[in-house]
Amino acid sequence: MLDKTRLRIAMQKSGRLSDDSRELLARCGIKINLQQQRLIAFAENMPIDILRVRDDDIPGLVMDGVVDLGIIGENVLEEELLNRRAQGEDPRYFTLRRLDFGGCRLSLAMPLDEDYTGPECLQNKRIATSYPHLLKQYLDRKSVSFKSCLLNGSVEVAPRAGLADAICDLVSTGATLEANGLREVEVIYRSKACLIQRDGEMPAEKQQLIDKLLTRMQGVIQARESKYIMLHAPSERLEEVISLLPGAERPTILPLAGDQSRVAMHMVSSETLFWETMEKLKSLGASSILVLPIEKMME
């Protein structure tokens, strides 16, 4: 029996979001053993329980108030939301924040030897998918009627097996589609992982813990998107050097021992520093350019 005074978080047990969710919680300072194949894991240093479940169960657990928070792909969340609305329900939850992992796209794909001129060419076609409600929402907006073929796996083999004329499935590189004689023709939904919270009153202690986790998640995500930059630069070209680092705060300037013509610059940049930028910095006279990852960050 779960202790309802503890914060309950649902995450994917295995699959596309599992490793990234585990890493995010660990970097937020939650000490928990997720190596054992258990449904529930308990944090050692915080009043938090982690429920490890199938990804398509997570939205329902949050909407039904079984857990307090869930880490889930927006595609799965939106599909469950549309499913419940189609059944006359009024599902409620809050999206606390979009996360920086789990990026994917839900796309239409057709056999390589068939022409595609737009969604209208799918009129009255049979389309295999694991996301019937997202597919229907998209094609309804295009005034296209279709026949749905619901599959929970191996959707890409449907046309070759004679089960469907086209498919609607998640795509990353497109290699799986190509291996099955298909090509991506239309992106209908773009998704990332997100953190959601159940509706209803939250005890003050739990809400304080949620707020703390959100602050830490912001720090983790911001740190992953930022770099700590150190370099030496000519004193007379400081502003030119700074202008090449968009997103950077004003740098810390330190004198160099025995060299009054140059200074050391330290700064945090929220932008990716590409090789081209480093080469431009060097052309301005910068040297000893170091770009370092940031583990944690709090403004």
UniProtKB/Swiss-Prot annotation:
Source taxon at top rank: Bacteria
UniProt xrefs under PANTHER family: ATP PHOSPHORIBOSYLTRANSFERASE, ATP PHOSPHORIBOSYLTRANSFERASE ATP-PRTASE
Summary of subunit composition and partner proteins: Equilibrium between an active dimeric form, an inactive hexameric form and higher aggregates. Interconversion between the various forms is largely reversible and is influenced by the natural substrates and inhibitors of the enzyme.
PROSITE patterns, A to Z: ATP_P_PHORIBOSYLTR
GO molecular function, one term: magnesium ion binding
Chief place where the protein resides: cytoplasm
Cell compartment(s), UniProt: Cytoplasm
Cellular component, GO, one term: cytoplasm
Organism listed in the record: Pectobacterium carotovorum subsp. carotovorum (strain PC1)
Disulfide bonds: none
Gene, per the UniProt record: hisG
Full protein name: ATP phosphoribosyltransferase
GO biological process: L-histidine biosynthetic process
Pfam families associated with the record: HisG (PF01634), HisG_C (PF08029)
UniProt keyword list: Amino-acid biosynthesis, ATP-binding, Cytoplasm, Glycosyltransferase, Histidine biosynthesis, Magnesium, Metal-binding, Nucleotide-binding, Transferase
Gene3D superfamilies: 3.30.70.120, Periplasmic binding protein-like II (3.40.190.10)
Essential cofactor(s): Mg(2+)
Pathway per the UniProt entry: Amino-acid biosynthesis; L-histidine biosynthesis; L-histidine from 5-phospho-alpha-D-ribose 1-diphosphate: step 1/9
Annotated catalysed reactions: 1-(5-phospho-beta-D-ribosyl)-ATP + diphosphate = 5-phospho-alpha-D-ribose 1-diphosphate + ATP
Entry function: Catalyzes the condensation of ATP and 5-phosphoribose 1-diphosphate to form N'-(5'-phosphoribosyl)-ATP (PR-ATP). Has a crucial role in the pathway because the rate of histidine biosynthesis seems to be controlled primarily by regulation of HisG enzymatic activity.
Xref: InterPro entries: ATP-PRT_HisG_long, ATP_PRibTrfase_cat, ATP_PRibTrfase_CS, ATP_PRibTrfase_HisG, HisG_C, N-reg_PII-like_a/b, N-reg_PII/ATP_PRibTrfase_C
Family membership: Belongs to the ATP phosphoribosyltransferase family. Long subfamily.
Keyword Metal-binding recorded: yes
E.C. code: 2.4.2.17
Activity regulation details: Feedback inhibited by histidine.
